[in-house]
């Protein structure tokens, strides 16, 4: 499994003039053959950004039926099931704070927390610098992932 960062979906839906769009689109077209996932927190981040440009109906589709929009798995927050909420929250905040102290945005720190717990094959993003030297999980662009696979 690979974890996808929000920029893959934002570029695909809203930035067809972006220089990365053709490569990004080629990657998105391959998603059905890739074991790809999006953490639930990343989905909320995506929808927070997209909400300014989507109709209410389309935004609801993204929020509650994202797997109908893109062929990816939406992951539950790691460790939430079977744990006391207070204990989970304390662990979650500590792990996310660890990312923030490594000079990461909140969204990237949350995704990194999920990645380091789920143990994916790679984190896929166009902004590899956001994760480089901050994790042992391999980080690559969609193009690099497609070339490798």
Each predicted region: which residue ranges?
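Acidic, PIN/NYN-like endoribonuclease modules and their adjacent C-terminal/linker elements
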Residues: 112-149
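Short, well-structured N-terminal submotif of metal-dependent ribonuclease cores
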Residues: 1-38, 51-64, 133
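Conserved beta-strand segments of alpha/beta enzyme cores
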Residues: 35, 71-73, 138
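Active-site neighborhoods of divalent-metal-dependent phosphate/nucleic-acid chemistry enzymes
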Residues: 74-126
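Helix-adjacent hinge/juxtasegments
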Residues: 55-85
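A short acidic, often aromatic-flanked loop/helix-cap motif at beta-alpha or helix-coil junctions
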Residues: 44, 79-87, 144-149
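Alpha-helix/helix-capping structural signal
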Residues: 8, 41-44, 129
């Amino acid at each position: 499994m690979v974890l996808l960062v929000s920029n893959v979906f934002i570029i695909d839906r809203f930035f067809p003039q972006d220089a990365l769009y053709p490569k990004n689109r080629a990657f998105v077209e391959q998603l059905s053959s890739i074991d790809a996932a999006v953490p639930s927190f990343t989905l909320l981040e995506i929808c927070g950004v997209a909400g300014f440009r989507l109709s209410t109906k389309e935004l609801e589709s993204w929020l509650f039926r994202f797997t109908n929009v893109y062929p990816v798995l939406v992951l539950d927050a790691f460790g939430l099931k079977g744990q006391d909420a207070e204990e989970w929250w304390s662990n979650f905040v500590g792990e996310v704070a660890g990312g923030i102290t490594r000079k990461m945005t909140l969204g990237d720190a949350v995704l990194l927390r999920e990645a380091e717990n789920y143990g994916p094959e790679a984190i896929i993003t166009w902004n590899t610098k956001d994760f480089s030297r901050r994790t042992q999980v391999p980080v690559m662009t969609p193009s690099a992932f497609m070339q490798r696979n």
